[in-house]
């Protein structure tokens, strides 16, 4: 039954009761009946509107079954768990190579992946693209001599397009401000140097990370001297 039909029936009933009712008591009955009828019509109208605009009704599934119901977080974890195919390398210093900075990949926490090679103490780039290049060294000494000590760390590139070594990143530090006085205690000093930057590289470019005073390198702890690239 539609709302219009319900309203029409209530109005006809009110007219019939008004004709039969007489006196004050009948008027009160008509008033109560009219109020009840109004509330009934209002309730029916409200219910009709709620059903019409689907405010109430059958509940929809919040998580429908099927391939479209993949949880975004689960999907992200699944994607991150897949092995990346981007070139990456992280090599560390060979602590047994005295008097020189020699890189090696066959060591714990070191790797060469997806085409990167270590050849002649240089990293060889496998593909064109943007790369993050980074390196860190740690120097250690005891006391300060009469002459200044300058420590340098440099990352260089030999490109395929021009066979000339070009410095990409470089830093210099001096750990000693003045000479240790004669007879005074020679205190130890430490100087870390970190280099890092993003560069456009070409396939078969060669990268090197070098220092000027390898005798000052500190190999006391692993992970202090390293060199690497990451394709972006």
From Swiss-Prot:
Intrachain disulfide bonds: 144-176
Main subcellular localisation: membrane
Chain ranges of the THD domain: 87-232
Membrane topology: Single-pass type II membrane protein
Maturation and modification: The soluble form derives from the membrane form by proteolytic processing. The membrane-bound form is further proteolytically processed by SPPL2A or SPPL2B through regulated intramembrane proteolysis producing TNF intracellular domains (ICD1 and ICD2) released in the cytosol and TNF C-domain 1 and C-domain 2 secreted into the extracellular space.
Cytoplasmic side: 1-35
GO molecular function: cytokine activity; death receptor agonist activity; identical protein binding; protease binding; transcription cis-regulatory region binding; tumor necrosis factor receptor binding
A Pfam family per the record: TNF
Residues the record lists as Phosphoserine modifications: 2
Ranges of the Extracellular topological domain: 57-232
Glycosylation sites: 80
Gene3D superfamilies, A to Z: 2.60.120.40
Any one GO BP annotation for this protein: positive regulation of hair follicle development
Lipidation (N6-myristoyl lysine): 19-20
Sequence intervals crossing the membrane: 36-56
Domain of life: Eukaryota
Site entry: Cleavage: 34-35, 39-40, 49-52, 76-77
UniProt family annotation: Belongs to the tumor necrosis factor family.
Oligomeric and partner information: Homotrimer. Interacts with SPPL2B.
Role of this protein: Cytokine that binds to TNFRSF1A/TNFR1 and TNFRSF1B/TNFBR. It is mainly secreted by macrophages and can induce cell death of certain tumor cell lines. It is potent pyrogen causing fever by direct action or by stimulation of interleukin-1 secretion and is implicated in the induction of cachexia, Under certain conditions it can stimulate cell proliferation and induce cell differentiation. Induces insulin resistance in adipocytes via inhibition of insulin-induced IRS1 tyrosine phosphorylation and insulin-induced glucose uptake. The TNF intracellular domain (ICD) form induces IL12 production in dendritic cells.
Protein name: Tumor necrosis factor
Taxonomic source organism: Sus scrofa (Pig)
Gene name of the record: TNF
